[in-house]
Amino acid sequence: MPSPVDASSADGGSGLGSHRRKRTTFSKGQLLELERAFAAWPYPNISTHEHLAWVTCLPEAKVQVWFQKRWAKIIKNRKSGILSPGSECPQSSCSLPDTLQQPWDPQMPGQPPPSSGTPQRTSVCRHSSCPAPGLSPRQGWEGAKAVAPWGSAGASEVHPSLERATPQTSLGSLSDLIYALAIVVNVDHS
């Protein structure tokens, strides 16, 4: 009778019961959603993980691990000197639309918001370390209105919860904002 070690060796294993985990392959759509979320909220809360899992049709654990590995990749690249600590993307090889290259601070009075044209939310950079452009968490709802393709007018007509008296800044309400924007974008494209 063969021993368990012999049986696993016959299967091509190392003989010590090692089990190689199946590697997850993400679709382009899943990666786009994850990169967008990471660019806007690099430290998502549990409800954001749950929402991303639902949107991407991935298990929540896979979403959580993706964020952990994305951060590890950034730290590794910074330590090895591939990218400078101040930027995730080498300036000479990435091009973003002008409206997304110029920072817009909604608290600055008199500063006009970015152009009213539909902004592109994907980077044309081919570096895997360059996140898709998005909102920084401190921009909150004002920043979301600035990059929304419909502008600030009309958002409440599609989804009444989009217009609020106070800016949304907590991670829980940011998750709600992502969901609401997804609804508006889906309604707008149907």
Swiss-Prot record:
Q: Gene symbol?
A: SEBOX
Pfam families tied to this protein:
Homeodomain
Superkingdom of source: Eukaryota
One GO biological process this protein is involved in is: oogenesis
- Ranges of compositional bias, category Low complexity: 1-11
Q: Which organism is it from?
A: Homo sapiens (Human)
Please verify whether the record's keywords include Secreted: no
Annotated InterPro entries: HD (IPR001356), Homeodomain-like_sf (IPR009057), SEBOX (IPR042223)
Q: What does this protein do?
A: Probable transcription factor involved in the control of specification of mesoderm and endoderm.
Q: Which residues bind DNA?
A: 19-78
The Gene Ontology terms for molecular function here are:
DNA binding; DNA-binding transcription factor activity
Q: What is this protein called?
A: Homeobox protein SEBOX
**Ranges in coiled-coil conformation:** none
Q: Record's family?
A: Belongs to the paired homeobox family.
